[in-house]
């Protein structure tokens, strides 16, 4: 078996280079190096960690052309796609962590009660040690740097396993972080970047040195990761697929909204976990929306990031083209209308590129396979809803529950959808705004569990240690004689405890008899 992985550009098929494939021994060594580095890093102050993030932010801004081009070469996306999906979101995450990270991880006081009035309590958020992030290929810079930012700020070290499909770029981004750490006097071994094939990946996910795993990917692989992690009872955050609905209720600001919808569908050629997979339009605007979508989609230009006249790039691989075409034909056979696209595209300039035509498929229903599977492709799938209730039924009619978006002038109607959508996130009159806001990111149903980003994400990669203490030096917990071992009289002990419960938790009208019972049996 080869010890290296050969990487190609999906936009034109050109050779990018080779990346080392790790074996089990390599993984063991990476974790040992990370463990040693973390022992020192966990003692750094929040100010020191902020200094590193500020330097990382400056590095990204200064080299954004270079980093965007690396992402484009390895994924086939356009520069605009890289700007939105790689650079902007990473800088926003850094900014949020700089402003809110310390507050997220400061010890938090917890309330007491009448019974515990002499006690104080707080929760301390401690580093776990070495954590792992197994990330998908659609956003190699952001998917690698996002977990690194959180891990390092929380005092952890991290092992990043990128996808084999984008190993070339993931390796470069991680090396950039390692070099930056070293230049600031910190150990570069805090960040380990590994590439391995599935038969070796199990060694990482079942490794006793890994204290938490974040996985971004598909359901089938998530089940393997979860089973592997269970060998060590390693906690998981699973961010899986979505079939995110976009509900259009009226024609208010329709042209502006369709611009947002187009970005939500075709960003990175539709390879976006929170991308719009289903457009659900109410009867009154359905036909208008189809016409306007066709006018836009039919003029989209495909090509490489180096072109000036390109709207959409290649897909990262052509290994799903047969299945995508099959899903579209299945839908057509069941009553859907293929208005535009629907098949792979042989680019005249880049015949070895992985291009799929932007597609408009309308009159979809939940009975079609394409309505139930995540496409992860440039497909605008449109459903007609007879009523708000019908729109909600369509939206909730899949096994997924990641994100959703709702557009409309009627705030009460938008709130109806927000309250009843079975998803982890909803954007009202916008697409994906919850991500930029650094809110807890994740889904429900079969879109995974756990959250990253926000307060919840940072605390999720820490040990939440609950600490109770005496508020007053002269007041301590004491065991009343009636219940102290050896218990003198079990019946009187029971009556004593019963009186205590009534005194502390009972209605005020029964306070006197409960206090009497407590005194009598003490």
UniProtKB/Swiss-Prot annotation:
Keyword GTP-binding: no
Main location: cytoplasm
Residues at the catalytic site: 239, 273
Gene3D superfamilies xref list: Aldehyde Dehydrogenase, Chain A, domain 1, Aldehyde Dehydrogenase, Chain A, domain 2
Compartmental location: Cytoplasm; Nucleus
GO cellular component: cytoplasm; cytosol; nucleus
Top EC group: oxidoreductase
Known EC number: 1.2.1.-
Pfam families according to UniProt: Aldedh
Protein name in the entry: Putative aldehyde dehydrogenase-like protein C21C3
Gene source species: Schizosaccharomyces pombe (strain 972 / ATCC 24843)
